[in-house]
Regions:
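Acyl activation and transfer enzymes in specialized metabolism, enriched
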Residues: 9-11, 147-163
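Conserved, mostly hydrophobic/aromatic
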Residues: 25, 45, 73, 92, ...
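Terminal-tail/helix-coil boundary detector
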Residues: 94, 118-148, 152, 167, ...
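Aromatic-lined glycan-binding groove of carbohydrate-active enzymes
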Residues: 83-121, 156
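Glycine/proline-rich, positively charged
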Residues: 1-83, 87
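Generic structural signal for well-ordered alpha-helices
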Residues: 30-34, 55-59, 89, 143, ...
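Glycine-rich beta-alpha junction loops
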Residues: 51, 77-81, 103-110, 164, ...
């Protein structure tokens, strides 16, 4: 974000979406974002890593004050981490709020079988390991099903994983550092999985404890260093 000189945006990060541990009932935060919209600095505002009740409170305040409301939410959501389906997905569906999740491929885990040649990031990304290693055994059951579906359709695991996600959200955030990453994401748009195939991919899923940013989304953690910068916070609900 690049705050306009006249806007009281000191409490809003210049480089990221509004962190969830801001008090989103805070009039000044929402007023500052609204001024950005009115000044033409941005057309719409979105939010990342929040609970559905936090988003509901923020938009209720915005509506009452005549401020711009959050029109999209970016959360952690993929085939092996589906906790957003509990409240956020149905809430956003009802309120017509766009879902644009990150970690669509679970840091590459949904693009290849365990043990296959991975990327340098896959071997060195401590934050991704923090998010996924604790549940690897149960997640690998789903990953194996993704591989089986990919073989059946003659496509990549990336295409299967993203095709599943595209049935749930507005548009996923997909990282790409090579041409085939872009090609795989584009092909997923054309891949249509049947209802039976979708259900089969989903069936082994078990509830996951919150990890990373959302595990830290508590009032008493507001002054802690962000989990992605330290990697030492414990997983918890």
């Amino acid at each position: 974000m690049s705050p306009a000189p006249a806007c009281p945006l000191e409490r809003v990060s210049r480089s990221s979406a509004v962190p969830a541990h801001y008090d989103l009932r805070d009039h000044d935060v929402l007023d500052g974002l609204n001024r950005m919209v009115k000044a033409g600095k941005t057309r719409y505002i979105g939010i990342s890593n929040c609970f559905a009740w936090q988003l509901a409170q923020a938009n209720a305040l915005a509506e009452r004050e005549g401020f711009a409301k959050f029109v999209s939410v970016q959360g952690h959501y993929n085939l092996i981490f589906r906790e957003e389906e509990r409240e956020m997905v149905p809430y956003c569906t009802q309120e017509n709020i766009a879902l644009t999740p990150y970690s669509a491929l679970a840091s590459g885990r949904l693009s290849r079988l365990p043990g296959q040649n991975g990327t340098k990031r896959a071997s060195e990304d401590a934050y991704a390991k923090f998010k996924y290693d604790a549940t690897a055994e149960q997640d690998n059951v789903i990953i194996a099903r993704v591989a089986e579906q990919a073989e059946k359709h003659g496509v990549t695991m990336t295409e299967i994983s993203l095709a599943w996600l595209l049935t749930k959200v507005t548009s996923p955030v997909v990282g790409a550092t090579k041409l085939h990453h872009v090609e795989g994401a584009a092909k997923a748009v054309e891949l249509q999985l049947t209802g039976e195939e979708l259900a089969w991919l989903e069936a082994p899923y078990l509830p996951h404890p919150l990890a990373g940013v959302m595990a830290q989304n508590k009032p008493n953690n507001a002054k802690e260093k962000h989990v992605w910068s330290t990697g030492d916070q414990k997983i918890g609900s």
